[in-house]
Amino acid sequence: MGNYNSQISTPKSVLGFEVGHKTATPEQINALVNKWARESNKANIVEYARTYEGRALNYLVISSAKNLNNLDKIKNNIAQLSRPKSLNANKIKSLINETPATAWMAYSIHGNESSGADSSLALIYHLLASEDADVTSLLDDLVILVDPMMNPDGRARFTKSMQEHRGAAPNVDSQSLLHSGEWPFGRGNHYLYDLNRDFYFAVNPESRGRIEAINQWYPLLMIDGHEMGAHDTYLFGPAREPINSNIPASLKRWGNIFAQEQAGVYDQKQWPYYTGEWFENLYPGYSNYSEYRGSINILYEQARTAEDGIKTQNGNIRTYKESVDHQFVSAIANLKSLQRHSRDIFNDFVKNRMSHVASKGKYANKSFVILPTDNTSRLNDFLYLLDLQGIEYQQTSKAQTVDDAVNHLGQTIEEAKVPKGSIIIQNRQYEAPLISAILEFDAKISDKVLLEERQKTLRDGSSIMYDSTAWNLSMMYGLAALEVPQHMTKNLVAFVKPASGDIKNIDNAIAYIVDGASDASVGYAARLMEQNVKVRILDKQGLFNKHSFNRGSIVVYLYDNTLEEKSLLTLIKQAAQDTGVQVKAINQGLGESDLPDIGGEYFKLLEQPQIALLSQNGINVEDLGSIWHMIDTQLGVRHSHLSHELLNDMDLRQYNVIVVPSRYYGTLSKSNISLLENWVKNGGSLIVNGNSAKQLANEEDFSQVKLLSDTFEHAADYNTALYREWLAQQKTITNNNKINAHKVATDLWFPWSDNEALKPMEEEQLTAWDDWSKNFMPSGAMVASRTDQKHWLTFGVQKQLPILTSNAPLFMAKDGANAVVRYGVLTKNKKAKAQQIGWSTTPKGNDLYIRMSGLIWPEASQRLANAAYLTQEPKGNGQIIMFANKPNFRGATKGTARLLLNAIVYGPGLGATTVIKL
C-alpha cells in the first residue's frame, strides 16, 4: 500500500483490530476520526448534527494543508460557480482552474449495512497518512468530504445485536441471527426511519444537518455506500431506466465514464460486479437528490457480510475484510476519475446551472402555486423544506388569473384564479431540476418502461419499480396547488411568516381559542389535556368577536376549569409556545347569526388520551416508528409501547387509545383479538393500520367493515349506501316541486334506478373482475379521495385529499360503519351519464377522478373507485378506526397524518362514550 506517516495513529492502535477484521462501533468510529483530525494538518472535522440518542454526526474535510488554509476562498469560488449568470467566460475559466473539485463520500446510512462505515476508516487513514505521490496529488486537486457513518443510532443497535449473537466459533451462515439481526433491526434511526428516503422530506435531524452540510459544498461527486443481499456480488452506478427526466444529460454521460473506469479496476482484481439490473433512478428522495443539484451520484451496493464472513453459493467464504476492501477500492477509483476529469465536469456543472435560469431553457416557463391555506403550521413546514434546499419563493400581493393551469386532478383550467397570499415557486432558478423533481405533479415514465412494467406484471406479478412512483410534495403535504405554464412575476412580494406562539388577549375573556385548521392545534390540545386542563373542540365553523374559527378549533373555556385564571393562562402560553399556535381570547359567547354558541352542542368536551402503541416482532417498523415519532414530536405527550406478544398478561384499562401499526408478517393471536374487542366495548378507541386492519376486517363479527373481495354478494347494498352518502352532501333538493304536492308522486328517482339500466355485474363476474384487477395495484401512487366534512376525523383536512397508496386493503362500509374517506373525487359534468365502475355507480352529471400522480393502471383505478380508505364505527362504548395503509408514511404524508392525529387525540372524547367520574 506504500509509505504511511507514523505521526498518524493507525486504526488498530485505537480500535484494537485492523479495519475490516471486526465491525467498529459508533463510539469507536467517532473517537478515531476525532483523533485523526487532531493529528493531521490535512483534515478538519465538522459536527453537522446530533442524533435523537445524542450521538455526533461528523464529516471530515480532507485535502492538502494549502487547500485547507484556503477553504473560505474555495467555498466562495464554488458558490460563485453555482450561480454563474453574472460571470463572464474568463472569470468562469479562472475560477474553475483555481478551485479544487469536491467529493462527498457518505457511508452506512442503513445502520445494519456496516462495511461502508468501516471502509470509510480505511479511506480516511489512507488519505491522511499515505505519503505516496498519487495521494498527495489527489489532495492537491480535490477537497474530499467524508461522512463516515450516517446513522450511528442504527449502527449501535446493529453492533449490539451482533455482540449478543456471536458464538465461540465463526458463523458463515447468512440465515443466522448474527447475520440477519433481529426486530427492529439496525436499518433505521432511533425512530426507525429509513434515512435513505429522507433527503428531501428532511423529517429527522440527521437528514436536516446533512442536507445543509452537503448543499454548501455543491460536490461534483457524491458516493453512497450500502449493502444488499448476502448472496449477491457488488453493484455500482449507473442506474437503468426509468431515470428521472430532471437529471441533466451530462451527469448520465459522466456516470457511464466513471463506471467504465471503476469496472476496469475491478476487472484487474477479478472481482465480480454489475450495474443497472434492479437499480433504477426515478425516485429523487435518496442521496441521489444531489444529482438534481449537479453531483455525479454513485451508489455502492456490497453483498452483505457480517464479521464472520458468508459462505456463498459457489462454496467460497467471503470475508468481512473483502467487503470493506471492495468499497475502499471503489472510492479510490472514483476519486481518481474525478481528479482526471474535474475541469470538464466543472464546465458541465456551470453550463447546467446557466441553463436552469435561461429565459428559453427547459425550466423557463413553469411556476408552481401553493394556494392559500389556514393550516399555517403545515405551510411553514413545507416552506422550511424549500429553504433547506435553497429554493426561492414569493407570495402574491393581490389576486390574479393565469391561463391553462393544471390542478392536482390533472384538469386544465383555462382561466385559473390565483388568490392573494398564494405561494409562487418559479421553476426558472438555479435549483430548477430539484424543484421540478419534487413539485411536478407527474414524473415522466417512457412508453418503453411502461411496456416492460406491464409485461412483468402480467408474467409474474412483479415490478421493475424499486420505490414509489409518486412523491409530489404538495400532494404529500395535502396542500392545494397548481402547475402554471408560465414564469410568474406579477404582484409578488416576500413571504412574511404569520405570528405564532402568542396570545391575543382581551378584557373579560371567557375562553381562549386556537383555530383547528392548523395541524399544530392537535398537539396544543394534547399538551393541555396532559396538564389536566379541560379542553373543548368546536364541531362547526364559528364566529366570535369578529374572529372566524374553523371546525376543529380548540377552546379552553374558563367555566370548565377550576384552575386560577393566571395559572391557566401560564399553561396556555406554554402550550402555544411549544406548538407555535396563535391563541385568541374571546369575551363573547354568543355566536353570530346561526353559528354555534359557546354552551351549545357544537362545543364538545374532549377526553385526555391515554395512549398505547403495539410493538415488537412482526410489526412494520417504519409504520411504528413514524407514529412513535409523531406522538413524541407533534403531540409531546406520554404514551406506552406494548408488546403484542404479552398483551394477554396486561391490564388494558389504563389506556383509552390503542394504536396497532401495520405488519410485515404474522397476525394478532385469537386471544389478542378477543381481548381488544372487549376493551373496545368497554370504551376504548382502537386505531388499526394497513395489514393489521386487513386482518381485523377479515375477523368474523369483529367489525362491520369488510374487504372489497368479501362483499360482492351484497354489492347492491353497498352501492345504495354509497348513493346515500352522495345524496346527503347535495346542496339542493332535486325533487323540490314534489315536496308540497298533495298528490302522491309516481315518477320518483331511486338510487337503484340507474343500476337497472346499467346492468351491474353479478357476484361471479365481480369476483373475476376483482381477481384480474388485483394484479395491477400500484407500487406507490398518489390518488384522489373525498372526505366526509361532517365527521370529526376530518378536522383540518380539506374536502379533496391526496392519498399515497400501494397494494393496500380496500375497505367497504355501510350501515353502522362510517366511510370517512373514500377513493375518488366526483366533479360536475352536465354531459356525464351514470356509469358502472366495478361494484359501484357514478351518479349522472358527475365524473370520477382517481389518479393524481404516479403509475396506476386503469384496472387499478377501477378497483380503487369508491372503496373506503378510512373507516370509523362504534362498537359497544368504544370505536374502531381503520386506515388502509400507513397514514404517516415516512413522516411526510401530512394530509393523511392529520387524520391519525385527530383519531389519537380526539377519539376518546368524540367517538367513544365518556363516563362522568364521581
Predicted feature locations:
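Active-site neighborhood of phospho(di)ester-bond hydrolases with catalytic His/Asp-centered motifs
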Residues: A106-Y107, D147-M149, M222-G225, N689
